[in-house]
Amino acid sequence: GVPIVPETAVVELIEREGIDLAVFAYSDVPHSRVMHLASQCLAAGADFTMLSGRHTMLTSSKPVVAVTAVRTGVGKSQTTRYLAKLLREKGLRVVAVRHPMPYGDLAAQAVQRFAAYADLDRYECTIEEREEYEPHIDAGCVVYAGVDYERILRQAETEADVILWDGGNNDLPFYRPDLHVCLVDPLRPGDERRYHPGEANVRMADLVIVNKCDAARPEDIDAVEASVREMNPLAQIHRCDSPVTVEGGAAVEGKDVIVVEDGPTLTHGSMTFGAGVVGASAARVSRIVDPSPYAVGSLAATYAKYPNACGVLPAMGYSSEQIRDLEATIEATPADAIVSGTPIDLTRVLTVSKPIVRASYELREREPGRLRAALDAVLG
């Protein structure tokens, strides 16, 4: 196979192997960082390039609706679920295909199909993977993922009328969309122009959703919308809310709680809070306890690398060791209960003594019916 080396070794690798071309191929990175890396490669003697969707996207025999974003944690998954519901209401068979999360044995993960919770265990899914697949399973939607996206597409086409691309990070779609929906975040105004390849998604999109309008300042909503209109004047722009509900919120009213949030949203997404904090506030908890002073093992390293996450607990669970560190940190933190803002049922993967209540969130259109009309215009 192709050897994997740290990015810090790129200059040495170019010089040692006489590399002619370096290709930048990952996502959710500030434009400035991309160009600093480009400068290193150019100085070492290699050309530097990025690949466009025209050269990377696969074409499906079925209609494709793609959901992407400008940053991690904007609300792609809830939007994908909402669109899947609208498509099913049209009597269409919908299959979601999720952007890859390649951990473990990649050959064994070439094509993965998830239709039941047992499939999550069979494929030994990480917490991050479960966060993406569980909500689809709960909604009765089959979801595919893996490594070989040509094989995945051809298998998904056998049981779908419509393919729903559920994007990861702020990456480009792997499949050529008939309708490209991109989400922007008014809680991070300006990021729609600052991150690669999120800006490309905005410029490519047929329809842009300004999400979380219920939590953002009106001036930031207006600024983000104006920014989108300047970059892509032909795109439809829809404003949506992301209301948070807490199941069993009365159980944590007046209590000291730990808030567990979606890991990627806090790490490379750079957020300081998520649905858990919003839900905890709505449930009138007494106090959100900062778990970072009690973090052990890999979680202590996570806080050191991402200090913005201090105050809440990122649900890092890419290995059994990280899950044990998560459990130990929860047990060591002096709190009465846990408010979970992750999309999964933590009780399925964690064993802790503190009770857990879930904060969940869904997409809500400010002008109901517009997304259905956009689907109808493409699919009939």
Locations of regions flagged by a protein language model:
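"Short basic amphipathic alpha-helical interaction patches in structured regions
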Residues: 36-38, 80-83
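Flexible phosphate-sensing "switch/lid" loops adjacent to ATP/NTP-binding sites
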Residues: 15-17, 65-68, 78, 85-229, ...
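Phosphate-binding P-loop
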Residues: 57-62
